[in-house]
């Protein structure tokens, strides 16, 4: 048990110093200590096990699938987890050089600022469909934040000669500063604005 105290992510970053400020996300963001963020899909066996998966691995997993934009998704980054682990590792080095902070803390801040608190759902009442504002569950907040961040990274890299590592570092730093120009923060604000209009 004494050995787990010295486990550093990528043998560089200490996760014990990382703090989740948002009380709603404390249970949904896992900062479990491990050297390599790779659990070989063990979390897929039970429904909410993904909440126990290290947040860095969840970012990597989310980055492996772009969504349903066919032209940009075909054959790109699908299943290339080792490649993405190295990408995240390099992006974290860039973040550490530029900010002087623990890059995992920057990632957690980026998730906190990109996670929407309100969303809309459809309710059919008397044959008429209404959009109603609802609160978002903590796990879904993290899911949406990771989706927004990974989509922003891939949108930035598409048809761009700059390497993905630099784009990833840039997008995470923008989101961590709650920059309104960050695509992930923009999407979160847009979602909350639509939800507020549907109250």
Language model features with spans:
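Strongly charged
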Residues: 1-85, 89-199
């Amino acid at each position: 048990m004494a050995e787990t105290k010295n486990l550093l992510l990528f043998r560089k970053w200490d996760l014990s110093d990382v703090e989740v400020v948002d009380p709603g996300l404390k249970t949904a963001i896992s900062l479990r200590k491990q050297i390599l963020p790779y659990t070989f899909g063990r979390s897929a066996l039970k429904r909410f096990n993904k909440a126990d998966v290290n947040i860095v691995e969840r970012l990597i997993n989310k980055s492996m699938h772009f969504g349903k934009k066919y032209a940009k998704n075909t054959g790109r980054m699908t299943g290339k987890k080792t490649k993405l682990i190295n990408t995240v590792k390099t992006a974290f080095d860039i973040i550490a050089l530029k900010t002087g902070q623990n890059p995992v803390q920057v990632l957690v801040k980026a998730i906190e600022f990109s996670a929407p608190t309100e969303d809309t759902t459809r309710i059919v009442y008397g044959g008429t469909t209404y959009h109603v504002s609802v609160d978002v569950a903590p796990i879904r907040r993290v899911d949406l934040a990771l989706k927004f961040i990974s989509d922003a990274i891939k949108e930035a890299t598409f048809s761009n000669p700059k390497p993905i590592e630099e784009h990833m570092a840039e997008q995470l730093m923008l989101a961590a500063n709650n920059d309104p120009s960050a695509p992930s923060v923009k999407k979160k604000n847009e979602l909350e604005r639509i939800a507020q209009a549907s109250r």
